Structure formats: structure tokens, C-alpha cells
Amino acid sequence: MLHTFTTFFSPFSAKMMYFCSLIINAMSVKKLRFAIFGNIYQAKKSVSIQKILSFLYERKAEVCIDSEFYTFLTDGLHIDVKVDRVFEGDDFEADYVISMGGDGTFLKAASRVGTKCIPIMGVNMGRLGFLADVGPSEIEHALLAVYAGQYKIEEHVAIMVETQGVSQLAGCPFALNDIAVLKRDNASMITIRTSINGEHLVNYQADGLIVSTPTGSTAYSLSNGGPIIAPQAGVLCLSPVAPHSLNVRPIVVPDDAVVRLCVESRNHNFLVAVDGRSEKCAEGTTLTIRKAPYPVKIIKRNTHKYFHTLREKMMWGADTR
């Protein structure tokens, strides 16, 4: 009879026991604090945000929400959002951050977290979702895992930019993906005098130059022919945008390298894009790009495997015929 009993439950017993352990562990932990960011252009997220808020409310979590996202939910989607606090900018404290949107929303959340080093969980409401990899149907299970402590935290390198000379950047100088120097206002190329650790590398004549982290290697850099770099590799990649010479190729340098850029432009200005946040700079401004003094902490499920995600997102091996 014992053998029959074991056989009857074996197909699903392991999965059920694991799920039950998440629930039991989640019920015994302290009150947690969550900060929520979201994309304000995706109405389809209304069901997901209600699911998250209900889950956290049942567990008496302390919840604060970004003011722009709060206004979108209450005024735009007419959702009754009950939270402990609405905040602006980086004026918040939390144990965990939840980013609802795509990778762009995740990058925005990471810039707001900054030196707080709060772990971020990305809920993917966008398209590709390398960073925001929790699907809407997986939200409850992912939150249960957080409460049960059954998750891992990946520390991703961030980079920062400093300016010397004519222009100063007004926005956040830190990037998780990339910092790009780009031409502005006309079709003429710009010249980017580039040095690594004080040693001259090359004068790029191109539409721009992307300095990317391993995390950003699957973003803008990839579309310009840059290599895919595993997240924990300690390197940065310099990828020229539409270079004049075909001999100029992307180059990988150690992530403790100091990259210095000085730009010449026919219309005497250019753009600096920090994770897509663009600002105008005047010719004569020197940019210094280096590794940030803190990592970005990303919550991943224990079952997460980078190369599996990469293969799925890139559709490697998929027959699209």
C-alpha cells in the first residue's frame, strides 16, 4: 500500500511541496517595505498592479509608489490604489523595488534607486524583457519567493559619466546599460577623440560611440554590431555607431578602465544619452566614463539561468518558417 500511495502522488508532489513551502515561509517573515515604479503608457498593466497590491495588502506590507505612476493609475485607469505613501524622484526607502513595464522602466527604476542599492524585481509588461523577466502570470509566485527568501540577487556593474569644460549634465549620471555620445541636428559625422587610462586609442569618425556594460551588451550596442557579454564578465565595450572606416570595430576593455572622450562637431554640439536619457553638450566638453562605485542589485528566481533566457529572447534555434 505504501508503494501505491507514493506512486499516486509522485507526478506532482515535488512541485506542490515546493509551492507550500513558499507559502509557509512567507507567512513567518517580518513586515516588508516595497517601492513600485511603472510605465505610464501601458493600460494593460491594470490587472497586474491590482494583483500585486492585493498580495502586498494581505501581508500588511508597507507600500509606496512613484507619483507619476500613481497619477496614471488613479486618473488615467481609474484604479483605487491604496498605498502608504506616494513619492517623487528618489525620495523613498524600501526593502525591495518592483518595476512594472519593460526594460526601459527597469532602467528608470535603477536610476532612482541609485546608491540605495535596493534589490529590484522586474515585472515584464513590455516586449523583450531581459531585465524585467517576471511575466504577469508569474507575479504571485515571484512575490511568494521573495517573502520566503527563496531567490538570488545578481549584482550588475553600472557606469557613470563626469563632464569637464563647457557643459555639465543635469540628469542622473549613472547607467546600467550604456552611455552614448551621438551627433545632433545634422547629417555630418562627429569626431570622438578617445583614450583609455590616459593612452590614446583612436579618433572615431562616426555618428556616435556607445560605452556599454555587460548588461547593456544586448541593447543599443548589439544593434551596432557589439558582442553579447555575460552579465558577470568584468568588462566594458566601446561600439562605434556607423563609423566612417570599416576597419573600426567594437573593442572590449576591463571594467576598471577610465574612458575619456572629447568630441568635435560641425555644429559645435552633440548629445549624451545615459540609458536613453539624452542631454545636449557643447563642443569642448570632455566626458570621463568609469565604473560606478555601486552595483545594481537585480532579483532573480532560483530557477533563472542566463543562457536559457538569452536563447529564448534571441530565438536561437527557432525555426520561423
Task: Please describe what each predicted stretch is.
Residues H3, T7, P11, K15-N25:
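Short, positively charged and aromatic/hydrophobic N-terminal segments
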Residues Y18, A26-Y96, S137-K152, T163-P173:
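ATP/NTP phosphate-donor binding region
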Residues Y41, D103-T105, L128, T215-S217:
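Short glycine-rich anion-binding loops that position phosphate/pyrophosphate groups of nucleotides
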Residues K45, G104-A109, T218-S223:
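Short glycine/serine/threonine-rich phosphate/pyrophosphate-binding segments
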Residues V113-V123, F130:
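Gly/Ser-rich helix-loop-strand patches that form or flank binding pockets
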Residues R127-D207:
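Catalytic core of DAGKc-family lipid kinases
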Residues V181, N197-H200, L246-R321:
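ATP/nucleoside-binding phosphotransfer catalytic cores, i.e., glycine-rich phosphate-binding loops
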Residues N203-N247:
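Gly/Ser/Thr-rich active-site loops/lids in small-molecule metabolic enzymes
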